């Protein structure tokens, strides 16, 4: 759902999107301003391997086999598709664990079995489920896969240079083995050996502004509010849903998510859910801090912050020990709207400061907290349950594209861009014109967790007449309180600078929502392959059509099967994908359609294999990140391995992707992670596929509309190739031989 001079992942600590933050929400962001001129300076939303997925079909027996590393293209000799290594990012199943873990010292993958529904129903919450620790992949396996992933993306001369550097790094008794041993020791001592490194690299070290660069948005179906009261009733119902959902979290009553698709039934780590309403991203001069509001000293927050006309109000949701009813919330919201309309009482739009670069916002906050009034106001915001932003009409047509832009950046200072507080993890936007959704600060949780929460809230809103838990009304409701600010000339200067930078971000974003309606995942499943793998190959073909090359690609893969797992990266720009896209474009006439079909199968099979590798903890990105950070701490200089241009290039994710399927009418979107890149978030539905494509106007090489057109052409071409496959042959590849699994590395 989720960026960008030269402090790239290989040199600096900063990064987002998968991953993207991505994410996704997406790939780690090159630290460069979204608008190129902005000073300072992610993210997928949906996550492959998350709590659910497209059921697809049984995987090809080799789909779960760790390629040693990804093999060069060998034409398939069977007409069947590879089975679906599901991207697993839709409605999750709620179930429990059934793990068979090898004895200590063995390096095989844990046997993660499917869990029968009856057994799943009896399982405890994830905290009690005994999830395994994230394994440490074998060093030589990671190094070999890294070279294989990059060989076809760099020149032969550059590859030979990088190969020699990698061989030296991984030599027996060398630095690589020393760092690997340190990592194994870290694994023994921590719940998750990569989580701290990943959080800092993906998000907290990133100095870019949060809007577009890091924070994804979920856009609801357009609402129709004939009057202001209708808008407020919707907001009141949404707040009521938040309180009900938070009560479930507080009592640990939410069943454990379990994976669908590949290795279905495995329980998933639920820790991220408990950061939905208790997290706050505190700006820092060089690194942000993710604050969790779980103090035993401070009382549990019982208020929501409402933003209206760029003003901020405290809405207490518990008064006299009673939770406000939906009717009470509506009454209080009406008071807030009336108070906000009093222009004589309006204060400067302090929320703008949170849209600035993180170092700039940290500097401004240092000035703000010198005054006790400002400290009190900041404290109320930082400890709130969530924000609810009552937006003014955006003044544009209410297409999917324009509504998404309102969520991503608010339209800038002149519209709703200042009616936000980007540091808070969840901001629910309820616009007077029916534009509604949620803006997410991505560091505490991944896209699928946000989707699960949001779908619960929307179901609550639509069924509130039956599900609302009503408390007795409080006869005398005290008026909500306006937060006060004292702004020095220095703060006024920061506000002016923040407003100008936000306008640059708004003008620079090239964004389009495109619905492909020729077919959806139903057709793809009939081909006996994973919808996610199919779409990923289509994205590679689309990019190659426009730019005649492939680039490092990021697709979020959930590793919530393990303790405190977040995401790793599926590197979708495989050698097999390159062979296929060249056959379809460069050699269109020379390669017969039947051979193109075989190449397509190989590309999907390679994508599927890497997906399984990633969701079982065997991908390379997190492993290399941890080795790099250990080297940074141990060595006077960063090893040549992590200064090499191939490594730096491998972490500039020109194509940042994430699958975020939904079961209700909504979709997710985010910005690119590098200045010359694309963000591509997609939502596969039975008969359609919705794409949110983003890029930057300042890059003359990219165009979101052209990319969307190329995606359409690619999906149609792939459908036409599928028509060559007789219906009787449309079945999974043979599954007689026993599936093998990738080496699971060192087990705790």
Curated annotation (Swiss-Prot):
SUPFAM superfamilies membership: CoA-dependent acyltransferases
Question: Outcome of residue 498 to L?
Answer: In CMS6; impaired activity
Compositionally skewed regions (Basic and acidic residues) per UniProt: 17-32
Q: Name the UniProt key words of this record, in alphabetical order.
A: Acyltransferase, Congenital myasthenic syndrome, Disease variant, Neurotransmitter biosynthesis, Phosphoprotein, Transferase
Where, by residue number, does CoA bind?
520-532, 558, 659
Outcome of mutating residue 211 to A: In CMS6; impaired activity
The Gene Ontology terms for molecular function here are: choline O-acetyltransferase activity
Where does the record place Basic residues bias?
Answer: 1-10
Name the reported effect of residue 506 to L. Answer: In CMS6; impaired activity
Positions bearing Phosphoserine: 125, 473
Q: What is its EC number?
A: 2.3.1.6
Q: Where is this region: Disordered?
A: 1-89, 727-748
Function of the molecule:
Catalyzes the reversible synthesis of acetylcholine (ACh) from acetyl CoA and choline at cholinergic synapses.
Q: What is this protein called?
A: Choline O-acetyltransferase
State the organism of origin. Answer: Homo sapiens
**What is the gene name?**
CHAT
